[in-house]
Amino acid sequence: MTNDALFPVDSETGWVSGLRQLPSPNCDARPEGAQVEVIVLHGISLPAGQFGGDAVIRLFLNQLDINAHPSFLPLKELQVSAHFLIRRDGEIFQFVPVSMRAWHAGISSCLGRSAVNDFSIGVELEGTDTNPYEEAQYRSLARLNQSLIREFPAVTADHLFGHSDIAPDRKSDPGPCFDWPRCRRDAVLLS
């Protein structure tokens, strides 16, 4: 597979080939008849502003040591996940099959509907609102988005949203440093 090749999505299992797969317990079945229509982009770092550790992965696997950092204490009972995490170096992890509902959006609305987890795929980018995202992340995100757009016809470049778009009173990620024009342009350039 070349660097620009799409990731094969197994429509039976929901797993994407070529990615590191770490199954999260923080997911469940989508409601009957629900189809993927949007991709929601998030920004995350644990501790805030620190990159490269395994805390985000541990959070999504319910293995975070809350005593490892004072900022982790409020996360003690939190059960969250996303379908994907893109690290600063562009490595992509998959936690939840795309056929399942990951617990990433929280209280939110999109396309005039609530319960966004029902019809979305969540992609976490390792980062913060105030730090520009890395070139490697944009390249990996472009390949992933195009692979998902090819798999799910209802998803288009116009159906890429930030967490801040679907929960504006609660969330600000992926933040003002995220290059939305590039993201949308790259999502269609690879097709």
Regions found by a protein language model. Name each.
Residues 1-114:
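N-terminal catalytic cores of peptidoglycan-degrading enzymes
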Residues 85, 122-124:
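Conserved beta-strand segments that form the floor/walls of ligand-binding pockets within enzyme
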Residues 41, 123, 141:
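Conserved, mostly hydrophobic/aromatic
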Residues 2-15, 33, 114, 119, ...:
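Basic/polar, cationic surfaces and motifs that engage anionic cell-wall
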Residues 43-44, 125, 164:
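Residues immediately flanking
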